[in-house]
Regions:
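A surface-exposed, charged beta-strand/loop segment in the N-terminal or early-internal portion
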Residues: 33, 39-42, 47-120
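Internal, conserved structured core segments that host functional sites
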Residues: 99-173, 179
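Accessory, usually C-terminal, subdomains that scaffold auxiliary metal cofactors
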Residues: 211, 232-252
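A structural-propensity feature for long, helix-poor, extended segments
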Residues: 221-233
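Small-residue-rich helix-loop
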Residues: 208-217
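Conserved mixed alpha/beta catalytic, RNA-binding, or beta-rich assembly cores of soluble enzyme
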Residues: 179-185, 189-193, 197-201
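Conserved small/polar residues in nucleotide/adenosyl-binding loops
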Residues: 253-260
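N-terminal, Lys/Arg-enriched amphipathic/low-complexity engagement segments
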Residues: 1-32
Length: 264
């Protein structure tokens, strides 16, 4: 696939299709597609045979589009975002740096509370499980989540959501952990894109503080939205799709579902 820029439009071209004399002309005419750059929120590059011009990269970043690159297993491994996404960026940076510890703890309290509430909603909708305990935990979250109710809720949530023998939520664990990893990676990119567009520094988190993590704030803000990915994965399993490998069909399902998020 060759990606280029023409009249502020992304041109997606399949050179091998054009060169193939055995294919009908009608099929060849469909070998080139154009998409408005301004309508794109996230672009996922998931093939080693993709060629992309610097003009396309520049146009995508100028329009605040997140660019994700994937490895041979279709897992996102790289993320490119614009350096300047907001005219008041410097002011926003200073506000982040000057945030008091009580404010930071209150923000994390709100984040954890919403995450548990969303987990409860997904668990009740998908698995029909009793969620009264999760509702209580959400209401009892203190400033900074000093009682670590996030972990308690997560243990109950994962035990009752998929009900797959031997399943625990582990990045390196058995399927559907692979589908969850993929969905979270796309969600993380969408959130990071939104933070940059808002003039915020994605590196400076309110809870995550890994010195090697360039997207600590994105990891914080995405927490309440993780159950959205969990519900998508649950539906994929219910439809009988093979979750042992991250197929193009499964990836497409995730990406289509995240289009709404990318427009936020």
């Amino acid at each position: 696939v060759y990606l280029s820029l023409r009249n502020a439009q992304l041109v997606i071209k399949l050179p091998e299709v054009v060169k193939n004399d055995t294919l009908p002309d009608g099929f060849k005419q469909q070998s080139e597609v154009t998409k408005p750059i301004e309508d794109l929120g996230v672009v996922v590059l998931d093939n080693k045979q993709i060629t992309i011009t610097s003009g396309v990269l520049e146009a995508l970043l100028e329009n605040n589009c997140a660019i994700i690159t994937c490895d041979s297993k279709s897992m996102p491994v790289g993320l490119m975002l614009p350096l300047y996404g907001n005219t008041t960026q410097n002011e926003r940076f200073r506000q982040q740096l000057d945030a008091s510890l009580p404010l930071i703890k209150q923000l994390w309290q709100q984040t954890v509370r919403m995450k548990i509430e969303n987990q409860a909603a997904v668990l009740k909708k998908c698995a029909g499980e009793e969620v009264k305990c999760m509702t209580i935990w959400a209401a009892d979250v203190k400033s900074g989540d000093s009682d670590n109710l996030e972990a308690r809720a997560a243990a109950y949530y994962w035990k009752n959501l998929f009900k797959i023998k031997g399943f625990t939520r582990d990045r390196e664990g058995i399927p559907p952990n692979n589908l969850l990893n993929y969905g979270y990676a796309i969600l993380r990119a969408v959130v990071a894109r939104g933070l940059v567009a808002s003039g915020l520094l994605p590196t400076l988190g309110i809870h995550h503080h890994n010195r090697y993590n360039a997207y600590c704030l994105a990891d914080d803000i995405m927490e309440p939205y993780r159950p959205y990915v969990d519900e998508l994965v649950y539906k994929i399993l219910q439809e009988g799709m093979n979750c042992n490998e991250l197929t193009k069909a499964v990836s497409y399902t995730h990406l289509r579902a995240h289009e709404t998020c990318a427009d936020l």
